[in-house]
Amino acid sequence: MPREVITIQCGQCGNQIGEVFWNRLCTEHGINPDGTLRPEAYTFNDRKDVFFYQSDDEHYVPRAILLDTEPGVISHIRNGPIKELINPENVYIDSTGGGAGNIWTKGFQCGEAGFEKIVEIIDREADGADSLAGFSLTHSIAGGTGSGMGSFLLDRLSDRYPKALLQTYSVFPNTTADIIVQPYNSILTLQRLALCADAVVVLDNTALDRIITNHIPNELLTNPFEHVNSLVSTVMAASTSTLRLPGFMSNDLLSLVSSLVPTPRLHFLMSSYTPITSSSLNVKEHTKDQEAGSGAVAGAAAGATRRQVHTDSIVQLVKRLLHPTNGMVSCGRDGKYISLLNIVQGEAESNQLYKSLQQIKEGRDVKFIDWGPSNMQMALSKRSPFTNEAHKVSGLMLANHTAIRKIFDNINNTFTQLFSKRAYLQNYIDSMVTGGEPEILEQFTDAQAVCTSLSKEYEAAESKDYLEYIGM
């Protein structure tokens, strides 16, 4: 029986990623933009029900909830390619429609103000699941809505659905602040991710921007945000492929998370993907007329194609996944792996995976913790027959690695620089319903303590005495 996953898209970033994600899932499952099934998809042995349900008229509807504090992005989705796909009853926009102004407390308060309506949507969607596995939240931690309302949801969902897994795809900000108060928003959200979530896939904007720059020539770099959203949706689709297109391993959310998270606090995951292609980055194809009118663009497109990775070797695929340049987090690989899962899609055999696993383990490319087993797993997922891929195999790595603490340290350091001056606090104070300045100062202090503790725990995980450190 499929174990269903409900996707909650929160804020501008979360909804933009979600739109591309559903487009991709529809393609992989042979679902048309209006929710009907392509004739050739009726015989395809997959698990659509994990992420979709069938309405009374047999149209497929995403198990998706769209939340925002202003109408812009959701209005775009309602008028876009998947406008007939989304259930309009699963959309909530704050009644004021004014947005959160990049202030975490405003986003949180909007969540509280709309709690009854939001929880009604969530409960209705959960009641429609036969065997709910959990929730998947897409959001950014830097702005106001994805961070503030996202934090509110993390608080409430962990209390209301204690048996359901709470997993997130969380976009972390660039090291150089795009939003001047993003250190405040980030540390308050990181606290909730540490305390409430069961697994967090960290998607670091610095690394995402680097990948986009390295793989798309300037002439074809039309909209960086679209390319980033496409890359993130590729990671999301690949990470859920074993749930939707199952093989023998990690075919439900619980087994996927439990294979990667050995202790409750160590649940922040890195990801890598290869090969990076034009489809995974949403690089538009050029017609012959366009190429004739612009030789430079045509040449750039050819160059982009030449840089794509084509390999049949599973070992080489995994080695590429292990290389930091293919990672979605910009923290290097100094430290140790706690656990590692490689999901391979395409024309591969189980014995190839086993042999490559043994070969990688025998090499010196991967350093594992000393207090547990060398937890490196391989999962084979079949590929959708409805996608046209130039390469025979593709791979996604989900890894629990101690180097992730560098991301936490960076957030902590930038927060300290801003907070030590008490800079830009007034907007946070003004949007507090109760408590005012004393309460927001206490929240910041508590959040920083959690962030510091989280970094120290990942550092301790590099030691053979880690289990003693956590009292086991």
From Swiss-Prot:
Extract the Gene3D superfamilies matched here.
Answer: Helix hairpin bin, Tubulin/FtsZ, C-terminal domain, Tubulin/FtsZ, GTPase domain
A Pfam family reported for this protein in Swiss-Prot or TrEMBL? Tubulin_C
Function, as annotated, reads: Tubulin is the major constituent of microtubules (Potential). The gamma chain is found at microtubule organizing centers (MTOC) such as the centrosome. Component of the gamma-tubulin small complex (gamma-TuSC) involved in microtubule nucleation for the formation of median bodies and in the biogenesis of flagella. Gamma-TuSC may be required for the correct positioning of EB1 within the trophozoites.
Q: Which InterPro entries match?
A: Gamma_tubulin (IPR002454), Tub_FtsZ_C (IPR008280), Tubulin (IPR000217), Tubulin/FtsZ-like_C (IPR037103), Tubulin/FtsZ_2-layer-sand-dom (IPR018316), Tubulin/FtsZ_GTPase_sf (IPR036525), Tubulin_C (IPR023123), Tubulin_CS (IPR017975)
Q: Quaternary form?
A: Component of the gamma-tubulin small complex (gamma-TuSC) composed of tubulin gamma chain, gamma-tubulin complex protein 2 (GCP2) and gamma-tubulin complex protein 3 (GCP3). Interacts with GCP2 and GCP3. Interacts with EB1.
List UniProt keywords, sorted A-Z: Cell projection, Cilium, Cytoplasm, Cytoskeleton, Flagellum, GTP-binding, Microtubule, Nucleotide-binding
Q: Where in the cell is it found?
A: Cytoplasm, Cytoskeleton, Flagellum axoneme; Cytoplasm, Cytoskeleton, Flagellum basal body; Cytoplasm, Cytoskeleton; Cytoplasm, Cytoskeleton, Spindle
Which PANTHER family did the record assign? TUBULIN
Question: Among the entry's GO cellular component annotations, what is one?
Answer: microtubule organizing center
Provide the residue positions that the database annotates as binding GTP.
142-148
Q: What happens when the gene is disrupted?
A: Knockdown of expression by morpholino results in an arrest of cytokinesis, leading to reduced growth rate and increased number of cells with four nuclei. Knockdown has various defects including increased number of disorganized cells impertinent for cytokinesis and increased number of cells without furrow. However, knockdown does not have an effect on the number of cells defective in cytokinesis or abscission.
Its domain of life? Eukaryota
**Which GO biological-process labels does this protein carry?**
axoneme assembly; cytoplasmic microtubule organization; meiotic spindle organization; microtubule nucleation; mitotic cell cycle; mitotic cleavage furrow formation; mitotic cytokinetic process; mitotic sister chromatid segregation
Q: What is this protein called?
A: Tubulin gamma chain
Family (UniProt): Belongs to the tubulin family.
Write out the GO MF terms: GTP binding; microtubule nucleator activity
